[in-house]
Amino acid sequence: MARPRPREYKAGDLVFAKMKGYPHWPARIDELPEGAVKPPANKYPIFFFGTHETAFLGPKDLFPYKEYKDKFGKSNKRKGFNEGLWEIENNPGVKFTGYQTIQQQSSSETEGEGGNTADASSEEEGDRVEDGKGKRKNEKGGSKRKKSYTSKKSSKQSRKSPGDEDDKDCKEEENKSSSEGGDAGNDTRNTTSDLQKAGEGT
């Protein structure tokens, strides 16, 4: 079947949008929000139903929804596709919320990190919406934790008695406790010689 000649679209038109590596996806021609990056010449801002992601596509990759519903409107196991088919039928006016979330995230970063759990969830939502249809950047971007060394310091400090100021005495006490069967879970300095001694005793 021959492709239709590219045509003009206006904000609010419902279409199937084709991106490389994805099926023809239910989408809407979006209006540009104020302060947004202007699209390249002859490209339209597209809002994808189901994933709520955006992209800029030319008219050759857009197909009118009503005309192509029978051809491209079949359910698909791709994540977000079936939700998109439902949304384009039942809630075609759904708004893109990621732009507002990204704005809130950038303003909270300039104020300083508060460690608020609500901020973390909005960060993940903002990261999901950045790269267009299914290509999600840093979906778990904020979930990695930096190693904390304060817990080791505090455990060593708790072993010191208030009268001890000499580090040698403290280290000797720690070595004695580990070799005499002290709490091995807290002391990770078991050397290979300690392990060899234990192996020879059996």
Swiss-Prot record:
The modification Phosphoserine is found at S121, S122, S161. A motif (Nuclear localization signal) lies at residues 135-147. Signal peptide: none annotated. This is Hepatoma-derived growth factor-related protein 3. It comes from Rattus norvegicus. Residues 168-177 have a biased composition (Basic and acidic residues). One of its GO terms (molecular function) is tubulin binding. Residues 11-68 form the PWWP domain. Residues 90-202 are annotated as: Disordered. It is found in: Nucleus. The gene is Hdgfl3. InterPro entries: PWWP_dom. GO terms for cellular component: cytoplasm; cytosol; nucleus. Keywords: Growth factor, Nucleus, Phosphoprotein. Enhances DNA synthesis and may play a role in cell proliferation. Residues 134-159 have a biased composition (Basic residues). One of its GO terms (biological process) is negative regulation of microtubule depolymerization. The modification Phosphothreonine is found at T110. SUPFAM superfamilies: Tudor/PWWP/MBT.
